[in-house]
Structure formats: C-alpha cells, structure tokens
Amino acid sequence: MKDVVVVVTGLAAMEPLTARRMMVGRTAAETTTTGTWTTVHILASMAARRASMTMTTHLRSRVRRIPTRPPRAPRLSVGGGGGTGTAPPARQASPETATIGTRTIGPSKGRRRRRRRMRRRRRRPVTSSC
C-alpha cells in the first residue's frame, strides 16, 4: 500500500507538531488504521481550535493599540482644512461645513446628522469569534 500523505491546511499548519504527526499518520504495517487516523484528526482539530483561539485573542489585544488614521479633509470647505471659511472662529460651525458669516456652505443639517450617526456606528472594532 502507498504511503498516506495528509495535507494540513489553514490553522492546523500553525502547529507543526500535529502536522508532523499527521504526515506520519500510518502505522508500521504500512496501513493507516482508523484509530490513528481519528486520533490524528482529533489532534489536528484541537490544534486548529487552539491556534485560532490564540490568534483571535492576540488580534483582540492588538485592536486597541492601532493608531487612528488622521481625519480626512472635508470635501466642501472653502479655505484650507476643517471648517475654515472667512468667518471668525467663534462663528464657525462643525469642520464638515464652512461658515461664512451666517451662511453655511455644505450638506444640509439632516444630511450632516445622518453622516455623523453613520460614523459613530462604523467605529466599533470587528472581531470574529471562533
């Protein structure tokens, strides 16, 4: 009988020990018995689970440390960056709109509100649970 080679993919490959054990998944009699096969399978699945768990926790611990990217410049202000019109700073609205005197150039109030709400929703970190 030919040698049985088991290909280890994905997370099981992270644990080289079980991978090796899977490669040598045949007995001395050149045959793969169901017993060794199942044990190998169980070991592999356990290894995969452990690896995935450690990975997710690792990533979860990393999430807080990612620096936030600098805010994009609003697409509508008249002057330079956020909220610079020719108005005095006290009269200026949010950085998303450019205020000149009392006249505001930019999206309407409702639109702005909706945008803010969307932005708030987007901030939650997404972590897959295994």
From Swiss-Prot:
Signal sequence region: none
Chain segments carrying region Disordered: 61-130
Subcellular location field: Nucleus, Nucleolus
CC terms in the record's Gene Ontology section: nucleolus
Main location: nucleus
One Gene Ontology biological process: negative regulation of ribosomal large subunit export from nucleus
Keywords, comma-separated and alphabetical: Nucleus
Residue spans of biased composition, Basic residues class: 109-130
Hydrolase among keywords: no
Keyword Nucleus: yes
Subunit structure: Interacts with 60S ribosome assembly factors GTPBP4 and MRTO4.
General function of this protein: Acts as a late-stage inhibitor of pre-60S ribosome assembly by preventing pre-60S ribosome export from nucleus.
Note in the entry: MINAS-60 is the product of an alternative open reading frame (alt-ORF) of transcripts coding for the RBM10 (AC P98175) protein. MINAS-60 and RBM10 ORFs are overlapping and are formed by shifting the reading frame.
Protein known as: Ribosome biogenesis inhibitor MINAS-60
Protein source organism: Homo sapiens (Human)
